């Protein structure tokens, strides 16, 4: 199945080297390359008797020393909560992230992030020490998680991360890329895995055992076991057993008949459901225009055009789209490419596709999701009427009572855009335009406050406003204001009566210099310079962002 493929060496006990996603690198002589786009996890303990398959090519003392530094820290800590850095010396982190501790300073750890290589200090109270000297307790959690897996599924399965690129040479093999996550379905003689990629179409197909590392989802650690132990621990089926289980599952869930009959049945059901919809509310066009971050959760701005001339602006999360995809694939198996005809040929898939959820979402992932979702909803609208007008699809685009969704006449939206475009001299014209989904700005990252900006700034200008801020903001109430300095983002809690001098005194300790200027932060760059108390009051009232620049 793979020419010149050799399994990794094992020690006298038959144990392979323990490796984690921190050790992932492309198969080359240079072990210094770092895969930056994947989240790494520390290893419980490292076997000194063996190394990964490709790593055996370079075993100089220097490299071995470096490997020890990376994978064998004296102390490993795990974040219990998320935290945003308040100074340039601190590190920001998300709940569940691991750090290596290099020093201890009263209430702070001096730590490094193995995923990014950044070093800094983190508050002790936000972390728990991960004790790697007690494998029994970790194994106990492994056993517990595996028991749950076996109880919930008829056949065992594993989760793995690809260590090296693998190019398929036969039709039954699966091409994989370093850093990819795989779902392991079965094995062949403990030398090959039947795997499916998570996050893209493809598979199932054969992947060499030595090209992946098995990860325990319950702990986030590489299991560190011999591959045979991992296979036995979850009763991973052989290829033949796996095929038999799949066949039995299909036989018990799909009635006999041709694809045409299945299609006719699936057409009849949705038509009955879509009969409830009003013709004037049929969806004509949909697009995903931008995304935002609110309460540490990303969401997407969806624009819909209806056949009655109205427009909708909707706030949706990625899980909403994915749940719909799962429902549609289950309700329309023929259109999903899951049925065979009498000749054994699979039906043609016409359903659009989006990748499944991932455990850790970043800004770059969300940008890619925004592009994928924009294509997904456009394809969804163009599906046959019995799908696109079904109740399932309709439910995604209805106006919800979430404080954001709204429906209005299309002419009203055009007038809003025209007014904003004519107001080029207004300080916040660019920001106001961005609150409309027709904005042409390239930066599609919005926050909840940004999308309310048009209402709050209808008569507001930093330099031109003579109206004093509302009395309620000058009291004890505080407002969170973000400021951006170089590559860092900071948050300040400011009272409504905060002065320009007080604002500078709060910012100065968090940056590298005492010589700096303040400007409003717009979506396409920096705006007006902030110099007066009234400008600061207006910023707090409108919950704007501040950009800090060295002079």
From Swiss-Prot:
Q: Which residue ranges are recorded for the region named Disordered? A: 1-73
Q: Which residues carry this modification: N-acetylmethionine?
A: 1
Keyword annotations for this protein, in alphabetical order, are: Acetylation, Cytoplasm, Cytoskeleton, Phosphoprotein, Repeat, SH3 domain
Under Pfam families, the record lists: PX, SH3_1
Q: Which CDD domains does the record match to this protein?
A: PB1, PX_Bem1p, SH3_Bem1p_1, SH3_Bem1p_2
InterPro entries xref list: Bem1/Scd2_PX (IPR035550), Bem1/Scd2_SH3_1 (IPR035548), Bem1/Scd2_SH3_2 (IPR035549), NADPH_Oxidase/PX-Domain (IPR051228), PB1-like (IPR053793), PB1_dom (IPR000270), PX_dom (IPR001683), PX_dom_sf (IPR036871)
* Annotated SH3 domain residues: 72-132, 155-217
Feature: compositional bias, Polar residues = 22-31
Q: Name one GO biological process term.
A: regulation of Rho protein signal transduction
- Any one Gene Ontology molecular-function term assigned to this protein's record: molecular adaptor activity
Q: Name one GO cellular component term.
A: PAR polarity complex
Where in or outside the cell it occurs: the entry states: Cytoplasm, Cytoskeleton
Task: Tell me the superkingdom of the source.
Answer: Eukaryota
- Ranges of biased composition (kind: Basic and acidic residues): 55-73
Residue ranges of every copy of the PX domain listed in the record: 278-404
- Report the residues modified as Phosphoserine: 47, 255, 258, 458, 461
What positions does the domain PB1 occupy? Answer: 478-551
The function of this protein is:
Necessary for cell polarization during vegetative growth. May link the cytoskeleton to morphogenic determinants on the cell surface.
Miscellaneous comment text of the record: Present with 6490 molecules/cell in log phase SD medium.
Q: How does it assemble?
A: Interacts with AXL2 and BUD5.
Q: What is this protein called?
A: Bud emergence protein 1
Phylogenetic lineage: Eukaryota, Fungi, Dikarya, Ascomycota, Saccharomycotina
**What would be the name of the gene that encodes this protein?**
BEM1
